[in-house]
Amino acid sequence: DHLVEIRDLDFAYEDRLILDGISLQIPRGKVVAIMGGSGCGKTTLLRLIGGQLRPSRGEVVVDGQAVQRLHNDELYALRRRMGMLFQFGALFTDISVFDNVAYQMREHTNLPEELIRDMVLMKLNAVGLRGAHHLMPAELSGGMARRVALARAIALDPMLIMYDEPFAGLDPISLGVIGHLI
């Protein structure tokens, strides 16, 4: 059973072909790394899987759904079941670490605030930042901000988590925490 299937996929930015004839299958429950040089299309592939881009040709299927054929409401429903940690996973700068992680829970569920509180603290604890819940993003180091972004990505226990350059620019402690969680 495959969580993600990519079939004969092409993608171009205007006339510049980025991905040409890509096919791959990602099984459920496995960690899969897509590796390659700068500019070879790794981030583009993740954006295609998440439905942020549409292929020029071919098909992206996630959990049995052809992503490029989904209407907006169906695509949003699928994305709620995905966690994405992109290289520049920006946090909302005007709300606390706690509220950054709680955002998806408040936006996409009807959970009571007490349960959201417990879940947020559990996710922050998982990334080693339980004591940082009251801080604002401007008060965080780069590694701490990436760990908060990871806590946000895993907030709703997604079926699929996509990481883009998850270790770029991390200090040794953050690298160890994120590597262990992946």
Positions of PLM-derived features:
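The feature captures the beta-strand-to-loop junction immediately N-terminal to the Walker
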Residues: M35-G37
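Helix-to-loop junction immediately C-terminal to a conserved catalytic motif
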Residues: G50
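Conserved ABC ATPase "signature" region
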Residues: Q65-A66, E113-A132
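ABC ATPase NBD coupling module
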Residues: V67-G83, E113
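Conserved ABC ATPase signature
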Residues: M136-L140, M144
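Conserved catalytic motifs of ABC-family nucleotide-binding domains
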Residues: D157
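Catalytic Walker B motif of ABC-type/P-loop ATPase nucleotide-binding domains
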Residues: I161-D164
